[in-house]
A protein has these predicted regions:
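Acidic, proline/glycine-enriched N-terminal capping motif
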Residues: 2-128, 133
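Conserved, structured C-terminal
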Residues: 2-10, 19-51, 57-68, 144-146, ...
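Conserved hydrophobic/aromatic beta-strand scaffold that supports enzyme active sites
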Residues: 86, 94, 126, 139, ...
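Conserved short loop/turn motifs at secondary-structure junctions
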Residues: 91-98, 127, 146-147, 183-190
Length: 351
């Protein structure tokens, strides 16, 4: 070493234990954290939070005297199904897509038909990876002739956006399509339950008709709320009840949450978190994160009927592999205890 010398000296100049670099876990100090627009309000309500895809989301809202999370979640579910509940769903990925060829583009990335979605309508779509496995699901609404807005699951927001960019830039660069992620630019709330329309009618400006006849199931549109604030309204349901999702620019998010809760007092409105959201989507039979784990096909999830046989799309060929069409593959099913007093614990093994 003395004869040959060394390369340019760089720190560390003497051996350092790897543990000095890694250190012990420092909690969330080195993690970026995103808060939803209703975070401040939720903290004021004593919400319990959970980290989901680098977001902090309200898990449930305990009331004084509730000592177990199930008490809070059961109350939130029951009140939502009986009257109305509000959930912050801002964390869902949101992608604005514009251009003359957006319909054709969406028709190539979703398994179901998107070529003729009418203006003012929303359609639920399923997206596959190239290997035929389910990548993500979500809704896409057509706000105008050449303007669509897509929603994705919270966990896959970045992956889906990256996938769409790859498809456009590498596979179909000639299509007139332009997209941008607006996940953090819009605050979005689910308003669900039998009284959801009555609550929204107190917030939506009077020149916007959201009656059942004017705004039917799966409708979408740009409206105004609270005296002229631009908003987007979607009549979609993650819970099985009459429900809407309303989106405003993020800077209005906190105010809108407070306004919705105040407007819903006469209906005994309840805020609900991710646990209640999960309960209601299971009761509805809606597939979500635990099922979209990268190892399931559309047929495994009972969604084979959505697949169009009249077009090609990403994952179509490999989705028809013999192994994916076996009759003995695991299928998503729902369980209900014979004795309603028996609890099915999460993570239990079926023998």
């Amino acid at each position: 070493m003395e004869q040959t010398g060394t390369t340019i000296f760089r720190p560390p100049y003497s051996p350092v234990a790897i543990g000095a670099f890694a250190g012990r876990r420092r909690g969330m100090e080195f993690y970026p954290t995103r808060y939803t627009p209703s975070h401040k309000w939720s903290v004021e309500q004593g919400a319990i939070f959970v980290e989901v895809g680098m977001w902090y989301r309200s898990q449930w809202f305990p009331l004084p005297g509730e000592t177990h999370w199930r008490e809070s979640v059961d109350r939130e579910v029951k009140q939502t199904r009986a009257s109305v509940g509000i959930c912050d769903v801002t964390t869902l990925g949101k992608i604005d897509i514009k251009g003359a060829d957006v319909s054709e583009f969406l028709n190539k990335v979703y398994v179901n038909a998107f070529a003729k979605v009418p203006v003012g309508k929303t359609r639920y779509g399923l997206m596959l990876r190239e290997d035929g496995m389910v990548m993500d699901d979500g809704t896409t609404a057509r706000l105008s002739e050449n303007h669509f807005v897509m929603t994705t699951t919270t966990a896959n927001a970045v992956n889906v956006y990256r996938h769409l960019q790859f498809c456009h830039q590498c596979l179909w660069p000639d299509l007139d399509v332009h997209m941008i992620s607006v996940t953090e630019q819009f605050a979005q709330y689910a308003v669900a339950g039998p009284n959801s329309r009555k609550l929204l009618q107190k917030v939506v400006d009077s020149n916007c008709d959201i009656s059942n006849e004017a705004f039917p199931y799966m409708a979408a549109g740009e409206i105004t709320v609270c005296g002229g604030i631009p908003a987007r309204l979607f009549r979609i349901s993650f819970s099985g009840e009459l429900a809407y999702e309303i989106a405003v620019q993020t800077r209005y998010g906190d105010s809108l949450m407070r306004t919705l809760m105040e407007a819903g007092e006469e209906f005994n409105v309840v805020p609900y978190g991710t646990e209640a959201l999960g309960v209601m989507r299971i009761e509805k039979g809606h597939a979500a994160g635990p099922e979209l784990n990268g190892q399931t096909s559309a047929y495994d999830l009972g969604m084979g009927g959505m697949i169009s046989g009249k077009k090609d799309f990403i994952g179509y060929k490999l989705g028809l592999r013999e192994d994916l069409l076996r009759d003995d593959r695991m299928q998503m099913v729902g369980f209900k205890p014979v004795n309603i007093q028996d609890l099915l614990q999460a993570g239990s093994h079926l023998l």
